[in-house]
Curated annotation (Swiss-Prot):
Keyword tags: Cell membrane, Ion transport, Iron, Iron transport, Membrane, Transmembrane, Transmembrane helix, Transport, Zinc, Zinc transport
Subcellular location: Cell membrane
Protein's UniProt name: Putative metal ion transporter ZIPCO
Gene symbol of the encoding locus: ZIPCO
Gene Ontology CC annotations of this record: plasma membrane
Membrane topology recorded in Swiss-Prot or TrEMBL: Multi-pass membrane protein
InterPro entries hit by this protein: ZIP
Main location: membrane
GO biological process: iron ion transport
Species annotation: Plasmodium berghei (strain Anka)
Gene Ontology molecular function, alphabetical: zinc ion transmembrane transporter activity
Amino acid sequence: MWLKLILAIVILIECIVVIYLPSHIESRIMNKKKHKIFNMENFENVASGAILALAFIHMLPEVIGLLNKNNLTIYCCFGLILISVTFLNITDILYDHHTENCSDIDNAEKNTNKFTINSASDKNIRDHIDIEMESLSIKENTNLSNNFIFDTFKSNAFFIVLSLFIHSFVEGLLIGSLKDKNPIIIVGLSMIAHKWAECLMIYKNAVKKTKDPILSSIYAWSFILSLPLGILVAVLSFSSNEFVEIIFSSIACGFFLYLSFNMTKDITVTKANKFYISFSYFFGVCGMSTLMIVFNYLEKSNVV
């Protein structure tokens, strides 16, 4: 019981630090000269590579094992992965479309304001502009009132957090359901070794992109508390559903594959930084792959 509690506290602290520390680092280095190696782009590349390794070495084999255990075809997993990748593409398109619409409304309002100043002497035109301004104001207020709903249900941040919350919750159930000391230590260390990459994904794709501070905090703390909550539920003797684990682990695997490449799309590659960008991504893949292989071996060998 105490060992599980210690692991839950360590992972909780790790998640808090990794989710909230990058924003402070970015604000400090914003006005400083960019370092060739130690900068946010390279750190994000390491995380992207680690996420790719997690998808192939940790999550996909886990799902395939559950499918074999329940005599289900592997195409179920690949179908869910394909659906999740397609879904994130659609939500990205919707998000970009929403951003463009907001920009168009702002530009229209600015142009109308200029037209009002230049034509103030004409009463008919002024009345027409007043009506147009009122319409724009109503439209803008409607957009503002719907922002919370849009950010919650139409951006991919919500679905990323939901999927990773359930996946992390199930990992907590796994730790909480173990009885022997050695497996608890091995599985716990494995969680600690890869949880930072998931935290960076939450920060990059949910916390950082969400303008509403309350919603951003909800996203962050939902994921931070997911694994300790899973441990608590398992300790209280609630069993997990393997079919639910198959569904959400497959979806999370698709999210990992998509986000591994999506997180690097805004990086500009130049002659000066292309080596560091390639090396950091390769380092993330190799480092996480090595960790997962070692912990999987220890878990199967029952050696600490």
